[in-house]
């Protein structure tokens, strides 16, 4: 794919290639389906992953192309193992909302996650 995607590519061209995405019953699938539909294109996943962290290994095995958060792919992009495909259409910004129950104590993992999310939000 490295030679095919040196220049920005349209979503219309992108759907000609095998596509890896989360399953149809996920908000991520709905998010990208809407993104493609806003540009008049029907998105279909050739391969569905159960979790977001399964997409990158599938891409690395040349099973197709997929959307994942940039921080998850940054290292392998920098190493030249995979490429970031430049798009003509600007992907929509995706936001998350952090909610918590302040009436009960949080686990250490929950506190670490909360801290990571807030640090990531401060960078933007």
Tell me the role of every PLM-derived stretch.
Residues 21-22, 48, 66, 99:
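Active-site-adjacent beta-strand anchor residues
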Residues 31-85:
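Hydrophobic hinge/microswitch elements
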Residues 15-18, 43, 94-97:
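Short amphipathic alpha-helical segments
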Residues 3-5, 18-39, 106-108, 114, ...:
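Secondary-structure junction motif
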Residues 83-124:
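A late-sequence structural motif
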Residues 25, 48-51, 89, 103:
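Short beta->alpha junction loops/turns
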């Amino acid at each position: 794919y490295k030679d095919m995607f040196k220049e920005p590519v349209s979503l219309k061209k992108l759907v000609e290639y095998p596509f890896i995405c989360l399953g149809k019953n996920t908000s991520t699938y709905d998010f990208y389906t809407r993104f493609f539909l806003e540009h008049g294109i029907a998105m279909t996943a050739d391969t569905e992953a159960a979790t977001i962290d399964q997409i990158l290994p599938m891409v690395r095995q040349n099973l197709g192309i997929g959307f994942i958060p940039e921080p998850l792919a940054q290292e392998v992009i920098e190493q030249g193992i995979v490429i970031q495909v430049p798009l003509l259409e600007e992907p929509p910004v995706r936001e998350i909302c952090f909610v918590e129950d302040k009436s009960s104590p949080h686990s250490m993992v929950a506190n670490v996650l909360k801290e990571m999310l807030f640090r990531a939000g401060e960078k933007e």
